[in-house]
């Protein structure tokens, strides 16, 4: 392999050879751009946009556009792009990853592709890892774009929807990866088009791309909330269910009954179909529910929750049996596996049935935190038409970038050669000895005024070393807080003569450590790592803090045989060898076997973590395909499309499904079970029951379907005429569809999550869990679509004109799964506090505790 590389060069070297002529072309415009006035330079933006409209491509414009940005940066910030930065800009425009060492000016590089791609007018997102960097870069680099006539926006955690919308509508938007992902999910939960904040996902430039697409890719983005306003509804429905009378099972409705004109009478408040595990309310039952909850029409869209919960309570009492389907143990309802008879702890029935059983058994009804929306970073960033990234360390993960994101990594040479000395790892027997050696090393460097940066993995270790340095009387700064503004200042000062800084490994990324002259004289920044990280890439990031732009510096890692890395992944035999050798205390161990053992352990961990991320992506891909379908359907509704044809298709599909469920095509007419068909169909579509005359008028079940479809469509058209304005009914269709889709999709996310957690057991049965998950997920998605159709059709047939037609969110967002503490400040009360005995602010004249305070 090395002979091949010597002969043909690395992948990066071969690619760079193709790019050099383009860089020369950019440089050739230098004098021409320098001769333009500010006004003429600004007008170039307009000229490029016009040329794009006339058919030129971005690649055609690249040399001139990059030269324009270069000149603008020189005039506005006094910074001119080096050749290597122009190379980086070209690679980013091509949708690749540029690996540029720390201090090579990645922030300035991003201005080139951002400007060029913003000319299309579709928006460019520059993605950073925290709010501080997004704000800093938008204010700093944004000056270049604004000078050239482009609008620059920034999205911060504290912003309102209106501010976010404005920022996303700018030509270039600076935003963190979390905000970008959560805004995408929130946009797919809105109920009016005007509430959307993002526009299309066109082009993303990801700063610290390895951190965003690899380190954070193991945790999906999750927006959670509580569906169902309160658990009290389950308890109320349980009380009602106990008061309702079960109707007698209706005997099969034969053809002879129909000929004799015998009408079937419904008895009781509800009927139970044990065969299909279905409970349906009779007319009497509907009246009882309406009286109990003091509502006018149970079928109205806003009463969907009540209707759903009443049916659940009836199912809990009539179809779910204690010690058969479930057991109650330690004040908890536990499901019994119907095939094995084993208790399944941790599993819960979905769609609220578990809560209904809890209410029935008088145990604490658990208020479920529901996942309202979720997506992984892998699938989210793959939605962009084009994406690129830059980082100081990506080559070690090149395979992952290529396999999962379709992006290759190009290593860009440094502007000046790196002269940092990377020493071999210093290995000690115990952690105590290692920390002692670190402190001695810091003391020696500090004595000659050399700045030192000590990188730790955990806050505990940074505090241990800090305490040891205090005892030695060495002044130092500890950086492990979450406040990014403070972090940048501390990191920037770490290059001063005699400075000692202790930082957790990831801290201070994005900020340069600049050396003063005395520090350079003393040997430059000395970087000490107190432990190897799980990924060589993060070790390299720490090393990369030193030796920027040709500065002197050195780096070394201190390791002990007690470190997690060596304990968990190092070979036990090796550890035994060193233990039996009896190494004297505080003495460094040096051995070739040890160095290779460390490298092998790191490779093992990296492979392990890559496997976890790949596995997560494969499972999420199943959800992703389903998510695309649901979100596309929602977007159609939001865009105000006429959904009439969609509803008609739902109606005909439901008729087909009901007929096929009850009457197979091979069955002779004499054996058709009209009773079951009527019960199933009229619960959804309030048609006149099918009778003997109808059966006589058709030859087979195909003709019966046709007859029932015609009747259902006519009935729907009659419902439309009840509304004075056709558009009023069209909006009602959209309201109902949104409400039902959202509710069912949220339940489906939960169900898929439960399936995902239990699917691993399939491996014991010699089955591939992923294949089983795909098949089961597909079936569940089909069921969800059928349920959406059924609920939508039922609601639209039963809706009454007097109700208000308003969209409302199905569930209230209560939080996300990412840390926002760094940006959230305590909220201050704006209104005066009202005490229980104060007069009520509503003006009733009563005390607050006897009036509005009761509800609070």
Where are these regions (language model features)?
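Short, Lys/Glu-rich amphipathic helical modules
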Residues: 448-462, 639-641, 693-699, 841
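Extended, charged helical/alpha-beta scaffold domains that provide interaction surfaces
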Residues: 326-334, 340-348, 549-550, 557, ...
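Short Cys/His-rich zinc-binding micro-motifs
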Residues: 830-849, 853
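Positions in alpha-helical segments
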Residues: 27-31, 617, 779, 838
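Conserved P-loop NTPase motor core
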Residues: 1-582, 631-632, 648-649, 653, ...
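Active-site-adjacent structural elements in folded domains
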Residues: 110, 438, 825-827, 835
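Hydrophobic, well-ordered secondary-structure elements that form the walls
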Residues: 454, 502, 745, 781, ...
